[in-house]
A protein has these predicted regions:
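The catalytic Nudix box helix
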Residues: 39-73, 128
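N-terminal strand-loop-strand
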Residues: 1-39, 88
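Active-site-adjacent beta-strand/loop module that shapes the phosphate/pyrophosphate-binding cleft
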Residues: 76-113, 125, 147
Length: 158
């Protein structure tokens, strides 16, 4: 059975509609940019409801509890490696400068015997939909398109 993740594509309206995307931490992702960002998401624990997992992961990855409104189900996508991601869109706000992600440990450098901690997310950014499509993992761009079907964009290039 494929691994399952759940996440929330947070959006806000300024001069234009913006969505919140996050960049994975750790050495594997350090020099990657285009097609490597994600919506805040993570694995659904056994017996956990996907929306509860999405809310938990949002808090863990950002290090903050966001007030969300206008929740909308954006469905599922299957990523290249087979993981199934379910997402919701929700209106909210967050200061990327306040990012305080949880961490994970791994051996680094490889075969060194040394374990290091890395943030699960090392950057967060508000971007317009066109930029989100460039930054996000390819399968996740569908969430941006689905969000735009239900949220009226505010004068911007889609």
């Amino acid at each position: 059975m494929a691994k399952r993740s759940a996440g929330i594509l947070v959006y806000r309206e300024r001069a234009a509609l913006e969505v919140l995307v996050v960049h994975p931490g750790g050495p594997f992702w350090a020099k990657r940019d285009a097609a490597s960002w994600s919506i805040p998401k993570g694995e659904v624990d056994d017996g956990e409801e996907p929306l509860a997992a999405a809310r938990r992961e949002l808090g863990e990855e950002l290090g903050a509890t966001l007030e969300l409104s206008d929740l909308v189900d954006l469905g599922e996508v299957r990523q290249k490696a087979g993981k199934v991601v379910r997402a919701w869109g929700a209106r909210g706000d967050f200061d990327p400068g306040a990012l305080a992600s949880n961490t994970f440990e791994m051996e680094w450098p490889p075969r060194s015997g040394q374990r290091r901690a890395f943030p699960e997310v090392d950057r967060a950014a508000w971007v317009e939909p066109a930029e989100a499509r460039r930054l996000l993992l390819p399968a996740q761009t569908a969430f941006v398109d689905r969000l735009l079907e239900v949220v009226e964009p505010v004068g911007q290039e889609q």
